[in-house]
Amino acid sequence: MGVLARIQGPDDLRQLSHAEMTELADEIREFLVLKVAATGGHLGPNLGVVELTLALHRIFDSPQDAIIFDTGHQAYVHKILTGRQDQFDTLRKQGGLSGYPCRAESEHDWVESSHASAALSYADGLAKAFALTGQNRHVVAVVGDGALTGGMCWEALNNIAAGKDRSVVIVVNDNGRSYAPTIGGLADHLSALRTAPSYERALDSGRRMVKRLPWVGRTAYSVLHGMKAGLKDAVSPQVMFTDLGIKYLGPVDGHDEAAMESALRRAKAYGGPVIVHAVTRKGNGYAHAENDVADQMHATGVIDPVTGRGTKSSAPDWTSVFSAALIEQASRREDIVAITAAMAGPTGLAAFGEKFPDRIFDVGIAEQHAMTSAAGLALGGLHPVVAIYSTFLNRAFDQLLMDVALLKQPVTVVLDRAGVTGVDGASHNGVWDLSLLGIIPGIRVAAPRDADTLREELDEALLVDDGPTVVRFPKGAVPEAIPAVKRLDGMVDVLKASEGERGDVLLVAVGPFASLALEIAERLDKQGISVAVVDPRWVLPVADSLVKMADKYALVVTIEDGGLHGGIGSTVSAAMRAAGVHTSCRDMGVPQQFLDHASREAIHKELGLTAQDLSRKITGWVAGMGSVGVHVQEDASSASAQGEVAQG
């Protein structure tokens, strides 16, 4: 029996010898490669925190002591050590193990958001709560190096530093991609001394003694202290933390488990806020990850664990289509610049950066700053393109509203991973953007249905010079092109026309749900229901031509991949009412709830967003229509209560 098989919880770690700990680290890496290769997931980050996490659970008493992982995708080892190794075959599968910390899974998981830079604020609040309630408990926050580029971390550090007697240990997982190692043995020695309680006592005693000397004493103390501080500043970056009043320990080899234990033990004993700087290597111990120049296998799909290779789809994905289209436009227009929040590769801007290195700005994990910086670029005569995941727009909403839209600045925001994203769970679904964007005065929002309309709508967005524009698209492969039958007033695409001037049902499809709407229309046609399908292209604001067309039908059904409250359906309905159009409306989309992880297809099926379910509902609505002017929102919960969700 291997060592890993004997680990059922953190207590088991404390019984192991140093040799067994080394063996356990090797077994965990082998386990991670085999399991993540089979399911997909965040491989590189977890290979880099094996020894670090082992040391954490040897020194601290979880869950009595709170261990919080920022960017929770680096918590796989934590899950293995807290009794969940037998569930890794279900990682990121419906009903299985989450790819992030999950409070429903284990008492060892304190939080579950995977958005970066939040852990220190959680830690600050927990430490205050423990102090106020008289609980002698430690708080540990594991912060990925990239997270420290987010302003929220520094807001939290400012507050943590004020709690001199509150035990908060901040482990900076520095994998070398953002921070340079601290220089020299003197820096190591000073760091070790300044975190030792005995040194603090000696320093306090010396300070009092020197200051009690005649008038020269205070001056001598200031000079000596200044010399030491100046020398320290010259050789070490830790001054940024010590100047805040937070003790710094490091750098520590994050792959030396014994060294990590020693550092964490001293940090724990200090009794106040301490930073432990652990230098790690992303993908450590797996050659294919170590040699992956792009991102050390940060996130993978299903791969062969021996070769490290996965099966790539031959179909282009939305991100690559956007990337090529932006480069084409930027080749013609020198005013186009790009902004990424530490995600140039995932959002398709890496190729742009290679071609135009002086016209791309990586602002770190700082979406708020990205948006206002974009406003500044626009004020300076440029047209910035901010490419972020839809779920991260939440953080930049105030800046988009007040710093971009209020000033009517031409900033184009490209939202990747819009709609249901699936396996990464509740925190990564991009289902909030349309509800948020709908309240911004003057904003224009496009939702392309295929590659051709993505290129076209991006081009149109880049021509707007009097306010912000948004282009949103989902994760994954681009569907086949869907040609329009005709275009109304240069705005709305009619994908299927009904026979005659009037019809029964008008389906309004948002973005890639166009193909779903056409499939529904085919089913309804067979039942003798007259149907037309339109793609608004620009879903905000609602086009007058769409409202006029709605007046010719008995029922309008909107189908969208975002939240129903404040979504496109309710916006279309409001536009119809304002124009005096009394056609009945039904909205189909995502309920306002946090969706558990599963494949996109499984989630859509669970929500009733399938051709079978929707055609069945629409048939029932048409058959039962006895009134007009009714606006009804439908989601999974209400449909289930009425028995309308298909079970097959």
Swiss-Prot record:
Cofactor note as given: Binds 1 Mg(2+) ion per subunit. Binds 1 thiamine pyrophosphate per subunit.
Q: What class of enzyme is it?
A: transferase
- GO molecular function, a single term: magnesium ion binding
Supply the InterPro entries for this chain.
Dxylulose-5-P_synthase (IPR005477), THDP-binding (IPR029061), Transketo_C/PFOR_II (IPR009014), Transketolase-like_Pyr-bd (IPR005475), Transketolase_BS (IPR020826), Transketolase_C (IPR033248)
Instruction: List where the protein spans the membrane.
Output: none
Annotated GO biological processes are: 1-deoxy-D-xylulose 5-phosphate biosynthetic process; isopentenyl diphosphate biosynthetic process, methylerythritol 4-phosphate pathway; terpenoid biosynthetic process; thiamine biosynthetic process
List the coiled-coil residues: none
Which pathway does the database say it acts in? Metabolic intermediate biosynthesis; 1-deoxy-D-xylulose 5-phosphate biosynthesis; 1-deoxy-D-xylulose 5-phosphate from D-glyceraldehyde 3-phosphate and pyruvate: step 1/1
Cited Pfam families: DXP_synthase_N (PF13292), Transket_pyr (PF02779), Transketolase_C (PF02780)
**EC number(s) in its UniProt entry?**
2.2.1.7
Positions of thiamine diphosphate binding = H73, S114, H115, A116, G146, A147, N175, Y286, E367
**Matching SMART domains, A to Z?**
Transket_pyr
User: Which reaction(s) does the protein catalyse, per the Swiss-Prot or TrEMBL entry?
Assistant: D-glyceraldehyde 3-phosphate + pyruvate + H(+) = 1-deoxy-D-xylulose 5-phosphate + CO2
Cite the entry's keywords alphabetically. Answer: Isoprene biosynthesis, Magnesium, Metal-binding, Thiamine biosynthesis, Thiamine pyrophosphate, Transferase
Q: Which cofactor does it need?
A: Mg(2+); thiamine diphosphate
Kindly state one GO CC term assigned in the UniProt record. Answer: cytosol
Binding of Mg(2+), residues:
D145, N175
Which domain of life does this protein belong to? Bacteria
Query: Which PANTHER family does the UniProt entry name for this protein?
Result: 1-D-DEOXYXYLULOSE 5-PHOSPHATE SYNTHASE-RELATED, 1-DEOXY-D-XYLULOSE-5-PHOSPHATE SYNTHASE, CHLOROPLASTIC
Family according to the record: Belongs to the transketolase family. DXPS subfamily.
Provide the function of this protein. Answer: Catalyzes the acyloin condensation reaction between C atoms 2 and 3 of pyruvate and glyceraldehyde 3-phosphate to yield 1-deoxy-D-xylulose-5-phosphate (DXP).
> What quaternary arrangement does the UniProt entry report?
Homodimer.
According to UniProt, the name of this protein is 1-deoxy-D-xylulose-5-phosphate synthase
Which organism is the protein's source? Rhodococcus erythropolis (strain PR4 / NBRC 100887)
